[in-house]
């Protein structure tokens, strides 16, 4: 199994798959917001930022997956984004399962002054909903609970890919017309 993760990590197809999966989740979030009329909360916006971090890691990995430095940089960005996204989504689930006046998220995102994403890209990062509202569910899980599952799966995959980097594997190249 580590062989598969190592092989995918040194090929562009693995990083492209990561990029496409993160962008598909972002597209799904935008569909829920603009197509179905669900309002994102501050925690939803923070989870989007974490997903964009994973997509950015996919772009870094696409640039030069055979170079160890680029691959490790992409893995670090992906791993940290998945960890942060997992912690944020767990807190989001806590807001939904234990709503109370003293256990609420803020209504305005707290981005750094040098990177006010909610001002620069309000279509993507402007929150309008409440964190304690669970207005959508599928198979008995709310959207925030599904995001916990998604970030946990991403984290496990990145952990396996990171461990696989220490395994020596022969990567067989396909025959090329030109060298």
What is each of the regions a protein language model found here?
Residues 9-19, 66-86, 156:
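Interfacial segments of alpha-helical transmembrane regions
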Residues 28-33, 83-99, 117:
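C-terminal TM-helix exit segments that contain a strictly Trp-centered aromatic cap at the helix terminus
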Residues 59-67, 159-166:
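Structural signal for the C-terminal ends of transmembrane alpha-helices
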């Amino acid at each position: 199994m580590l062989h598969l993760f190592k092989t995918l990590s040194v090929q562009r197809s693995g990083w492209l798959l990561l990029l496409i999966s993160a962008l598909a989740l972002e597209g799904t979030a935008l569909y829920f917001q603009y197509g179905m009329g669900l309002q994102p909360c501050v925690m939803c916006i923070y989870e989007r930022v974490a997903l964009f971090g994973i997509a950015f890691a996919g772009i870094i990995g696409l640039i030069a997956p055979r170079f160890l430095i680029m691959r490790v940089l992409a893995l670090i960005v992906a791993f940290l984004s998945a960890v942060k996204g997992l912690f944020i989504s767990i807190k989001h689930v806590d807001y939904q399962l234990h709503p109370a006046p003293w256990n609420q998220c803020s209504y305005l995102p707290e981005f750094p002054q040098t990177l006010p994403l909610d001002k620069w890209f309000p279509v993507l990062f402007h929150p309008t909903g409440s964190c304690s509202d669970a207005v959508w569910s599928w198979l008995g899980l709310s959207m925030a609970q599904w995001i916990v599952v998604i970030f946990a799966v991403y984290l496990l995959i990145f952990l396996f890919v990171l461990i696989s980097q220490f395994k020596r594997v022969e990567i067989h190249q396909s025959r090329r017309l030109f060298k």
